[in-house]
Regions:
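Catalytic alpha/beta active-site cores
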Residues: 1-231, 261-262, 310, 451, ...
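Intrinsic disorder at enzyme termini
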Residues: 8-11, 29-30, 35-36, 45-47, ...
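Exposed alpha-helical structural elements
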Residues: 17, 21, 120, 146, ...
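A short alpha-helix capping/helix-coil boundary motif
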Residues: 72-75, 222, 265-268, 337-339, ...
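Active-site lining segments that contact anionic ligands and/or coordinate catalytic metals
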Residues: 219-221, 258-260, 296-298, 356-359, ...
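Active-site capping/gating regions of soluble enzymes
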Residues: 225-257, 262-414, 543-553
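A short beta-alpha structural unit
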Residues: 306, 341-346, 445-451, 484
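Generic hydrophobic alpha-helical scaffold/packing signal
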Residues: 322, 345-348, 352, 359, ...
Length: 569
């Protein structure tokens, strides 16, 4: 039987036949509907093939994969759990505990600087001889820097890692310590696209390299930092593209052989939300896997509740994300997991070419500092950021638990953290949820007909309003319009939405508005335009609520109208 099975063959399906079947499934809509675009405008096709890859990239594929694999020095990565505490004693206790439970590095954020005791620094110095240290954004007055003076000169060559900050200078004895950070996180968190992130890293490098006479000495001093978002394949391609771009950059400085710099990635707070915080754990898992498959060397996973204040349990969850990846997926046994993927190779090349061109534009404008001072970067980032917020508001992109599937039973946790950033995608929803948690208007869904007919629209409206923190009640299912009119007249509510099946909406609303009580804000579920919509508004209907509408604008409109009613009694 098995020999017979081995003889089974399958007909080869060519692209043309696949496309023909795909077009039929679209039922008259154009094939181009299956093509989406990234925030940079790069087209994402529904199918990538070997033939298409060879046609568009040719021998570039081999060059890309060779570079990615040769410049990744190990097949694993360092688990770098960040430690945040209010005192040096707590910091050391938390750090020691995390190192015993799977953390592989000492991570200190100078933005959350604390006062250090001599005893704590002494304990830290001992650990630095065993574990790599990543201390970022230090200020000259930060007491943390004193630890480097406490390590015996004969032991300093054992210390490895990174320390960055203003006017931070280390003894030459620290031969394995890097002091320069090429950082794309700021533009990323402000809403940037991947092409801009990559180009900015190269521009920073070009400016910093001017202070060195030898490229190898320069390379030995730097680390590259990325924030990794939830766009899985795009983020994989970002890290891969950087390795190729860096090799090209190094070769232009006369470097021979393969050039490699360590990449430190962290989960992106741009995608984190204070709402339904456990969803952040899913985002962190997605982002972590993308970073690892992309080839990061060091990875920091932020706890799911980092925006409101992490605790021992959430830090454990964050650490376990990486431990699960290492122990249960074997991703640390392979270099360049996605190499050869038609989609990833194509996307990687797109980023390489576009980022290099943009980097050259920046250089022509005078380099990194001149470009920053010109305001051109902020203009570009702002445009991308506004598009991101618009996509979230119009539900073109999903933030689970925030702009879709909002859980009103989940408590809104209040709290602050030094890692709070200015342009998180969830912020507009968080503000609305916080507002309506304090005071809630009475909202009624005015349902007409059979449950099976009005339920789809009623469920949509309920979910739509929940994203802003608004709870709803259902009216009785009115069998007649007159029954609905009487109920509306005799029932107190602040805002109502008429929910009827699409087929019956026109008939029901036309009759309903003939005797609609004044002074009540009532919308219709569904998108209606033209003369019909105008007539309904003239008859007392306030507006409409529909799929694809700007949620934030609509929710703020409801909020504003209710505030006016409350204000004027």
């Amino acid at each position: 039987m098995i020999d017979k099975m081995k003889q089974v063959t399958f007909d080869k399906v060519d692209d043309a036949l696949w496309k023909e079947v795909a077009i039929k499934s679209l039922r008259g809509q154009p094939f181009e509907k299956l093509i989406s675009k990234t925030s940079e405008g790069i087209e994402i096709h529904p199918l990538y093939t070997k033939e298409l890859l060879e046609k568009t990239l040719g021998d570039k594929v081999e060059k890309i994969t060779n570079t990615v694999r040769q410049t990744k020095k190990t097949d694993t990565w360092i688990i770098a759990q960040a430690t945040y505490s209010e005192s040096s004693e707590m910091f050391m206790a938390d750090l020691t505990d995390s190192l015993e439970r799977g953390n592989e590095a000492i991570v200190y954020d100078g933005k959350n600087n604390i006062s250090w005791t001599t005893e704590s620094l002494s304990q830290l110095a001992e650990l630095m001889l065993i574990y790599p240290v990543y201390a970022f954004d230090l200020k000259a007055e930060d007491e943390f820097v004193n630890v480097f003076e406490m390590i015996d000169e004969s032991e300093r060559k054992k210390v490895q890692g990174v320390v960055t900050g203003n006017n931070i200078k280390l003894s030459k004895d620290y031969q394995k310590m890097r002091t320069l950070s090429l950082d794309a996180r700021e533009v990323h968190l402000n809403g940037s696209d991947i092409i801009t992130e990559l180009a900015i890293i190269l521009a920073q490098a070009a400016e910093a390299a001017e202070n060195f006479t030898n490229f190898q000495n320069f390379e030995d001093q730097i680390i590259v930092r990325f924030a990794i978002d939830t766009e899985f394949f795009l983020e994989i391609s970002k890290i891969r593209a950087f390795r190729v771009l860096w090799q090209t950059f190094a070769e232009n400085y006369g470097y021979k052989g393969y050039s490699s710099v360590p990449i430190h990635s962290e989960t992106s707070l741009r995608s984190y939300s204070k709402l339904d915080e456990y969803v952040n754990l899913l985002r962190a898992g997605n982002e972590s896997l993308a970073a690892v498959i992309g080839g990061t060397d060091i990875l920091t996973v932020h706890p799911h509740n980092i925006l409101t204040g992490s605790n021992a349990l959430s830090r454990r969850y964050a650490r376990n994300v990486q431990l699960v990846l290492k122990e249960e997926t074997y991703v640390d046994d392979v270099i360049d997991h996605s190499g050869g993927s038609y989609f990833v190779e194509t996307l990687t090349n797109e980023y390489i070419e576009a980022a290099w061109d943009y980097f050259l534009e920046i250089e022509e404008l005078g380099g990194y500092s001149a470009f920053i001072n010109s305001g051109e970067l902020e203009k570009r980032v702002k445009k991308t950021r506004e598009k991101r917020f618009s996509d979230i508001a119009h539900n073109k992109k999903s933030l689970i638990g925030t702009n879709v599937y909002a859980d009103l039973s989940a408590p809104i946790i209040k709290g602050d953290n030094p890692l709070e950033i200015a342009h998180r995608l969830a912020e507009p929803y968080e503000k609305l949820r916080a507002y309506f948690e304090e005071k809630q208007p009475k909202i009624v869904l005015l349902t007409f007909g059979e449950l099976k007919d009005f339920k789809p629209r009623a469920d949509f409206v309920k979910g739509f309003l929940a994203t802003g923190g608004l709870d709803v009640e259902f009216s009785p299912a009115f069998k007649t319009v007159k029954e609905g009119q009487e109920w509306i007249k005799t029932t107190e509510f602040d805002y109502g939405v008429i929910c009827v099946s699409p087929k019956e909406t026109e008939e029901v609303v036309n009759e309903l508005v003939e005797d609609l009580p004044k002074g009540k804000t009532i919308d219709i579920a569904g998108k209606y335009t033209g003369e019909e919509a105008s007539n309904w508004k003239n008859a007392g209907i306030a507006d409409f609520i529909y799929k694809g509408q700007n949620q934030i604008a609509k929710l703020n409109e409801i909020k504003q109208k209710w505030e006016e009613v409350v204000k004027h009694g």
